[in-house]
A protein has these predicted regions:
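Pocket-lining segment of extracytoplasmic ligand-binding domains
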Residues: 30-32, 41-43, 72, 109-111, ...
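Extracytoplasmic/secreted proteins, especially bacterial periplasmic and envelope-associated proteins
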Residues: 13, 17, 75, 93-100, ...
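Short, glycine-/small- and polar/acidic-enriched structural segments
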Residues: 1-90, 94-104, 115, 156
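An extracytoplasmic/periplasmic, membrane-proximal ligand-sensing/linker region
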Residues: 139-152, 156, 214-216, 224-326
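Ligand-binding cleft/hinge of the Venus flytrap
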Residues: 1, 95-112, 131, 148-151, ...
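Electropositive, surface-exposed helix/loop patches at the edges of structured domains
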Residues: 49-52, 64-68, 155-164, 171-181, ...
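Ligand-binding clefts/hinges and TM-proximal coupling segments of bilobed small-molecule sensing domains
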Residues: 82-100, 176-240, 245-250
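Sec-exported extracytoplasmic/periplasmic mature domains
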Residues: 19, 23, 71, 103-107, ...
Length: 326
């Protein structure tokens, strides 16, 4: 079998060939969820909600969260009240992650000192130089490693998995997060001293709903049945294990993947009900997009986005669903 890989600088560039039909698969980040919802960078006349389906995902040993300077006595998100929290211009995903962590602690942006930065790297430089106290990131990225080695040090606020109300607030902002015991993180963290935090799958192998079922079936069989053959071949491969899959996540699975999980006895009635709800949600979004774009929407980019987000929220709420994004 011949495989051709098309690299992309960001999720939009990676998802464009999937949208146009040039490729059948995308190994994407969390923007695949934004694409399925038609929000943020996908609330654009050229995009809108996409019929995305999950093949499989990887949850590895790293986490995603707010890196905090180690010298301000922060142990959980609620301790961030009154602290200097970074906000990155033009990076919705990072800012939403920060907002979700604040929500876990019962906080909003109004409860902290919001410090704007032009980019992710500058925010970490700001922590080290004592201009700000936090930045959202992947736990194993170079910037938090640099912070850990600085005089300020680093901590990762803990998210108690038993705090049901905290998790409810967090997932109301960013439903793709899930509790995770993080063993790879900058600072004094390890298998023996994990960070009890959060993560979401990365990469997320997605296809379109109409992708050839034979391809989807072949892929999920290989990922599951040949796991022992590839799990140690590269860092993070262990995250593709069946035990690591969240079968009630935020993007629907491809029909062939659902059929396979049923075949091996791993699919429950609750999972099917969740899948049906996600597919219904996506159908509502795509029909709403079709109606909105067919009724002479504003040509101004910001007005177009605002109109779409209003129409989107109205349609989802009418169906008893949480818009999440507004």
């Amino acid at each position: 079998t011949a495989v051709r890989i098309l690299p992309g600088e960001n999720d939009v560039s990676r998802m464009t060939p999937l949208k146009t039909g040039r490729v059948p698969l995308c190994a994407c980040g969390i923007a695949s969820y934004y694409g399925s919802e038609g929000v943020l960078m996908f609330a654009d006349p050229n995009w809108g909600p996409q019929p995305i389906r999950v093949i499989t995902t990887s949850i590895a040993s790293f986490g995603l969260g707010i890196a905090v300077a180690g010298d301000i006595d922060v142990k959980s998100p609620k301790d961030l009240k009154g602290k200097r929290v970074s906000w990155i211009r033009g990076d919705d995903a990072l800012n939403l992650g920060t907002e979700a962590y604040l929500a876990f602690g019962g906080l909003t942006w109004d409860d902290v000192e919001k410090v704007e930065f032009p980019g992710y790297g500058r925010a970490f430089e700001g922590i080290i130089s004592d201009q700000v106290d936090t930045a959202f990131t992947v736990s194993v990225a170079p910037p938090p490693q640099q912070l850990a080695a600085s005089p300020r040090g680093i901590v990762w606020p803990e998210l108690d998995p038993n705090d049901k109300e905290g998790w409810k607030r967090l997932q109301a902002v960013a439903p793709y997060f899930q509790p995770h015991k993080v063993t790879s993180a900058a600072g004094e963290y390890s298998k023996d001293n994990p960070w009890i935090g959060a993560s979401y799958p990365y990469p997320i192998l997605v296809a379109n709903a109409d992708t050839d079922p034979k391809l989807a079936d072949s892929l999920i069989r290989v990922f599951h049945e040949d796991f022992d053959k590839y799990k140690d071949a590269a860092p993070g491969n262990g995250g593709y294990s069946l035990d690591s899959q969240n079968l009630e996540w935020v993007i629907p699975f491809h029909d062939a993947v659902v059929a396979y999980y049923k075949e091996i006895g791993e699919w429950t009635d609750a999972m099917q009900a969740h899948q049906d709800k996600l597919v219904k949600r996506q159908n509502i979004l795509m029909q709403t997009w079709k109606t909105y774009t067919g009724n002479n929407p504003p040509s101004d980019e910001e007005a177009f986005r605002d109109g779409w987000m209003d129409a989107r929220a109205t349609a989802l709420e009418a169906a008893g669903m949480n818009p999440v994004f507004r």
